[in-house]
Amino acid sequence: MLAKVNSAALYGIDALRVEVEIDLASGLPQLATVGLPEGAVKESKDRIRAAVKNCGYTFPAKRITINLAPADIKKEGSAYDLPMAIGILAAEELIEKTQLDNYLLIGELSLDGSLRAVRGALPIAMAAKKEKVKGLILPVQNAPEAAVVHDIEVLGVRNLPQVVEFLNGAQSVERVQVNLDDLFKQHSQYNSDFNDVKGQQHVKRALEVAAAGAHNVILVGPPGSGKTMLAKRLPTILPDLTLAEALETTKIHSVMGILNGQAIIATRPFRSPHHTISDAGLVGGGTVPKPGEVSLAHNGVLFLDELPEFKRNVLEVMRQPLEDGNITVARALGSINYPASFMLVAAMNPCPCGFFTDPQKECTCTPLQIQRYRSKVSGPLLDRIDIQIEVPTLRYQELAGKEAGEPSAAIRQRVNGARTIQLQRFHKRTIHSNAQMGAKDIKRYCAVKEDADKLLEAAINKLGLSARAYSRVLKVSRTIADLAGSEEIQSAHIAEAIQYRSLDRGV
């Protein structure tokens, strides 16, 4: 007897339809799985046998062959437990086959027949909609996430008997639906605000400029000056996620299984990996490729604290995602492209002891030690960071001051205004922010007045900026002009942008 059940396989951050074919034949009782199954899929036969028996069904004492088609795509994870079990029962004619073509099934089985959550419910729901199946049957824990996709019937189930009864028409399962507008309102609040930060007005201004133009930032300052606190609040002044951005961000987190019960991610991600992370952990990889931190920070902020402590090869692999907004992971079975459009915020001490620029504590480092410490971060990587800003230690008067800082909402309003100007400027292009401008765009949109040009020339000659750094100054100047509502880049905008090249000036 033969039965076919629809399921799906994850490929990158997308999903592909998989047909689970089950054949029961005479012979010695055994269960063989073919179609490039990974370890967890091969182990599923024991879970399925126990679950079927513990739910009161008879497991067929026959030669069972399960094929996962197409066979050239690697199948991993435990999401095939449910479609395999349903296929076996359908082949034994315990389930009506008429409904099987209408639904796509995923879910991990416990030994008692209950269902556990699986990874990738959102991209699988999108694949089901694309394949024009009627609905998706999956564990109830994954249902809110999958229900974000409209125009498909999402059915959350708790155990194997519930699925069997539903497919036989003996029991109904309530369709899970969510209101996207309510979800956005519920999950779009941040727990921190820029008015939590005392002082550091010039750093806040630099971060406002960075947010307005999507520029990468490096914060240089002694320990305890507030670098991490400022970085964590950067997402609160970035423009709100659009629905398309939220869905793409949620897909990445869904594939990694780290949604933690959320139906959708409605706030900008903030990722802060430890400096001991490997290159595969940062950009993605592994035997079975998975997204790295740069992809988990997609549409948000990637914060690298203690930048010189990261391994040099780890930092160098970030060049591609910083330039292209995506990362390609190549393996023998093919290449997978992950989105990685993020704002990089790095933090570092000015020297090994941390007090080179501190007016109160004396630095104990030699010039050679300082040079070696800073050389751990390569010039090409620093050139890709538009804004370099010093974060000094706060004085007591600033710490003890009771004056409330400007809230994130007020700063975000100005940032939104600048972003609107940029969207109008690039509406016929594939880019959407000043940081993404290429050489032709800079030539077209970053024309400066004569007095501003002379100021820029003097700064370039004195600081010895590279050609890429020169472009960064012009991009930042364009953003400052946008914040000021100015069509032309003026000398004041150039002067402020040059101030954001701290490392070029030796801090």
Predicted regions and their residues:
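Peripheral, non-AAA+ core regions of ATP-driven protein-machinery
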Residues: 1-218, 225, 330, 469-470, ...
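Short beta-strand elements
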Residues: 18-24, 282, 386-389
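Basic, amphipathic alpha-helical bundle interface domains used for macromolecular binding and assembly
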Residues: 40-45, 60, 67-77, 288-289, ...
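Alpha-helical scaffold elements adjacent to nucleotide-binding pockets in ATP/GTP-utilizing enzyme cores
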Residues: 47, 51, 84, 123-127, ...
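Short loop/turn elements that form and flank the Walker-type P-loop nucleotide-binding site
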Residues: 59-62, 99-100, 132, 150, ...
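Short, well-ordered beta-strand core segments
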Residues: 136, 302, 386-389
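Switch/coupling sub-region of P-loop NTPases
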Residues: 192-205, 214-216, 251-315, 320, ...
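Walker A/P-loop
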Residues: 219-258
